A protein has these predicted regions:
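Active-site acidic carboxylates
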Residues: 1-65, 69-70, 86, 133-140, ...
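A short acidic, amphipathic alpha-helical/loop segment
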Residues: 52-55, 79, 105-109
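Glycine-rich phosphate-binding loop signature in dinucleotide/nucleotide-binding domains
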Residues: 83-90
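A contiguous pocket-lining binding segment that forms or flanks enzyme active sites
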Residues: 91-149
Length: 203
């Protein structure tokens, strides 16, 4: 999770900030549910970029957190690359606060270094939609898999019979996909009846 900082979040204009924040937290919660090794990093946190948003640091109090004093691309920071290598993973799920810089730069570098990179575009953002589209196109051309957080979550769950993660995954969908929550509520009403209306339960 790259540069999701209080200051830089304000620069995202191609998606509502409330939706953007929700997407980032959904991805973070998914990583937590599946016990994925997670790395946080921030650029120039003591300046206008600001601190990492507190929801992330609260979710991952023990995660490696790399504060970069200079490098714009996280992959240009030796500590960040060392933290990635220490996970032992060859597949990387990456998101950065800005798609065209914070995500695309390290994603391209990681791909060139031999990693299988999944770039989560809706947990990243841009100044405008054209910049977002061009950045995603460039990553796809390089062989990076550009996906959204819901696809990542569903892919990791894969089967609702995986009981150790199913409840957590369902909760993430309920919290961060409004239509899914409404659908579930509607189903429960049909199944259990609507209180006060004396509607029959389905046996």
């Amino acid at each position: 999770l790259i540069d999701h900082q209080a200051g830089t979040m304000l620069g995202v204009q191609d998606i509502k900030l409330s939706e953007f924040r929700s997407n980032v937290l959904a991805l973070a919660k998914t990583a937590k549910i599946h016990n994925l090794p997670t790395i946080l990093t921030a650029s120039f946190a003591e300046g206008p970029n600001g601190p990492l948003i507190e929801e992330l640091t609260e979710l991952f109090p023990d995660a490696p957190t790399i504060y970069r004093p200079g490098p714009i691309s996280a992959w240009d920071d030796a500590q960040f690359v060392q933290a990635v290598e220490a996970t032992g993973r060859k597949k990387l799920i990456m998101s950065g606060v800005t798609t065209d810089i914070c995500l695309m730069f390290p994603a391209l570098q990681a791909k060139a270094a031999g990693y299988d990179v999944y770039a989560v575009y809706d947990c990243s953002g841009c100044w405008d939609q054209m910049s977002e589209m061009m950045s995603c196109m460039r990553m796809v051309q390089a062989g990076i898999k550009v996906v959204n957080w819901a696809a990542v979550t569903a892919d990791l769950q894969a089967d609702w019979r995986k009981s150790e993660t199913a409840a957590g995954t369902l909760e993430v969908f309920h919290q961060h996909l409004p239509f899914y929550n409404f659908l579930s509520n509607s189903q429960n009403a049909v199944k259990n009846g609507i209180p006060g209306l004396n509607t029959p339960k389905i046996q």
